[in-house]
Amino acid sequence: MTLNLQPIPEHKVLGVCHFPTFYQAMETTQHLVELEPDAVELVDQTMLELASEIPQFQDKLKRFLKGKPGSLLLVEFAGEELSLLKQKLKELNELLETHGFNDAVVEAIDPKLQKEVWDVRKSGLNIMMSMKGDGKPVSCIEDCAVELTDLAEYTSRLNELFEKYGTTGTWYAHASVGCLHVRPVLNLKQEMDAKKLRAITEETFAIVQEYKGSHSGEHGDGLVRSEFHELMYGKRIVNAFEEIKKIFDPSSLLNPGKIVKPSRMDDRRLFRYGPDYKPSNINSGLDWSEWGGFDRAVEMCNNNGAC
């Protein structure tokens, strides 16, 4: 086995591209990659608004955010010569101007400023889950992937789908590869929204299939997506999954209910909030009213341990 290791680039620069609308950001992504950036990451308006309410991000946002954009695309270039990377930022500005976006780039050449920008982006899930109230961004379609030429139309159709079911979605992450982390905002304590979860998932996967995309472009396809493998892979491949599982794990001890013979993704017994869920009435001794009570503050947790 040969590992093709590469040295870590000596320098990095970052262009924070501001767009009036989410759709324009998605439409422009396919052109940004022509500059061969190392990353193009999306930060949507919802994430910016939520981050602006969190003290640890407020000062950071002021240093790279201009006005109230509909979305940001963070475009990073890396290499050995800083002068060449600065030229890339110039080309980035010129490219956006040709598409009608003048003075749209905040340049981050100072590593400290770059870190502050990435701190906001890398806290994306934590920021999204800080949404107050029972409705939360729900993981079910969060790593579908499509070609960049289809990205604007695909995301537009998903927003129409969310509107059809009386909700909205949150968006962030890997625009450069057409794999955005999108989550519909639902209250899974309610049976009605649990039904919406399934409907949105099924209809989204049908849309993804139209574009010959992937229903699981990054995160894996366990409890939520295994049920839909036949739609994406076909019966023959799914049968092969079952044969391999039977050979190596005949008693189904390893990760039961995932990939092979899965449960329904909307089985509420598997939910964080099951059908019988009731919040605990805890007298905390502290004032949690800003969060709607101590139990609501606890429910903001997304279990990733970043705090």
Go through each PLM region and give its residues.
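Noncatalytic alpha-helical scaffold of FAD-dependent oxidoreductases
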Residues: M1-A173, G178-G217, G222-C307
